[in-house]
Amino acid sequence: MIQNFQGQDGFVWFTGVVEDRQDPDKLGRVRVRCVGYHTDNKTKIPTEDLPWAWVMMPTTTSSMNGLGQTPPFLVEGSWVIGFWRDAESMQEPVIIGTLPGKPSQFGNPDFGFHDPRTEDKAVYGPYPIRINESDMNRRSVGADYLAEARKEEIYSNIGTADGETWAEPESPYEAIYPYNHVYETESGHIREFDDTKFRTRIHERHRSGSYYEI
């Protein structure tokens, strides 16, 4: 009889923090430091000694031949929850989701359970980049942090061939939580599907400032 497999005697669960997403095999795996299983002392357990965790994908992604959305969008510093696929052996973690919160302090790369990267080594981050606010996207909670930048980008008194002029309209953004559904990338590309009553919008924006809004 096979020993130590998921579901045999229930599941062995964990919560933890992602410390590495540079999977050498490019399978979307991440290294996770698990609360209660791993110490925060990196001299005892350095990041590179943590096991690679597989990331469970939704059924809208086939996990086959690149179909669907890949790779998983976890970053260093993400809090996650999962289980050990090999149960009590605890060498094959599987992540089933993330846990948002309200970070109260910036990461300390000298300790575990933090983004281990320093600013000079992080392409984006290190995370969190903001503290004392919700992990929800700012635009999803009604904070239009693009408003001032957009005002400077708006064109007005643009001439036309028939001698008339026109002006680019201001954004109708008036999002109310929890009805604005936002997807944002690390570099700043944004996609919004806003279901705020009487203010529904679709908005897609390139980090350079180019956008469309319906």
Name each model feature, range by range:
Residues 1-214:
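Amphipathic alpha-helical and helix-coil boundary elements used as assembly
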